[in-house]
């Protein structure tokens, strides 16, 4: 973080300073990540109140506290009405001090892939900061912005949400030059209520654009009519591997089990791209990243080089060669209807006997059964050879697939999966489920067993 004094923060955050005025160059909300002299922000959540950990923060080396009430502790304290809001305001101030060119993105699925692709491209152009992991909520976005320093030329900020208004808040802190909605699908329906609710929440990202900013959206499933009032007269770019009239599209597509080759078509010209990631949906992700990067000046050569240097991310269609002719695709990090059906299409293009291993999709509310059935029907239409499921909801996937088996626990599923592997000369297995399903346990079991 750039250096700032407590007296400066008092003005920035409209707070009250008690104690000495010191200079700060680091901030944390986690007592496990304290650095000497840092500012400890005492956030209050539904299940915790970090004010209770102030003594621990002092013992760990914190130099000052950001609190919502005075504490009986010998440390300088900046007292504000709401530490969560103040944390965001501090991040917004840091963002305003740094001249880096900033882009932001959201979507129902593929956010992390697009973020990684965009960061890889912009890293060809200059020093690039990007969201670590999935720190994309109303706490994670400020954490990322606070890492900005004058050394950065670019920043790629991922915005997520599970309720209305969250992205409107985080994009107001981020102030991007360009903003992208990667796609829309049934995700977090418990918080949004419907796909229309998802669209409204994702469209909030465009409210943070300046008048000369660029709104970027997927031409295949955008919600343009509802977003038009938010976008106003700002420039709009559309991307799609399917729509030839899009601003960013792909031609000459050639898909293999290890990656994709295609010609990227853009408003400034075309370039041949080698994308070392499996799946047609990653072509759309690459188009999104190309558009987002080009909005802040990336060249075609930078786009080509950045995409070519990509590495697969564990848990996100990460290829694991169990043995010769035995390929495991670890897509266990998370799941919703959109990413599940995309994974089905990836598996459909893989060699040998194709097995889809699924856990539950979470946070779908009243639409849960219908969404799980939709994935099963997609597997059936794609010709997947076998579907194995585990969990409370995923039986709907295996049943709808017509080639499914459901298991009471992962141990039974893994036993069956090992038998299938032993029976097949060539096999590809794709493992996927929501974070709460912990399907990485299946992946680990197969890896530990080697050739099974």
From Swiss-Prot:
One of its GO terms (cellular component) is cytosol. Coiled coil: none annotated. Keywords: ATP-binding, Cell cycle, Cell division, Cell shape, Cell wall biogenesis/degradation, Cytoplasm, Ligase, Nucleotide-binding, Peptidoglycan synthesis. It catalyses: D-alanyl-D-alanine + UDP-N-acetyl-alpha-D-muramoyl-L-alanyl-gamma-D-glutamyl-meso-2,6-diaminopimelate + ATP = UDP-N-acetyl-alpha-D-muramoyl-L-alanyl-gamma-D-glutamyl-meso-2,6-diaminopimeloyl-D-alanyl-D-alanine + ADP + phosphate + H(+). Pfam families: Mur_ligase, Mur_ligase_C, Mur_ligase_M. It comes from the Bacteria. It is found in: Cytoplasm. One of its GO terms (biological process) is cell division. Its main location: cytoplasm. GO terms for molecular function: ATP binding; UDP-N-acetylmuramoyl-tripeptide-D-alanyl-D-alanine ligase activity; UDP-N-acetylmuramoylalanyl-D-glutamyl-2,6-diaminopimelate-D-alanyl-D-alanine ligase activity. ATP binds at residues 107-113. It is an enzyme of class 6 (ligase). InterPro entries: Mur-like_cat_sf, Mur_ligase_C, Mur_ligase_C_dom_sf, Mur_ligase_cen, Mur_ligase_N, MurCDEF_CellWall_CoF430Synth, MurE/MurF_N, UDP-N-AcMur_synth. Pathway: Cell wall biogenesis; peptidoglycan biosynthesis. Its EC number is 6.3.2.10. Involved in cell wall formation. Catalyzes the final step in the synthesis of UDP-N-acetylmuramoyl-pentapeptide, the precursor of murein. Monomer. Belongs to the MurCDEF family. MurF subfamily. This is UDP-N-acetylmuramoyl-tripeptide--D-alanyl-D-alanine ligase.
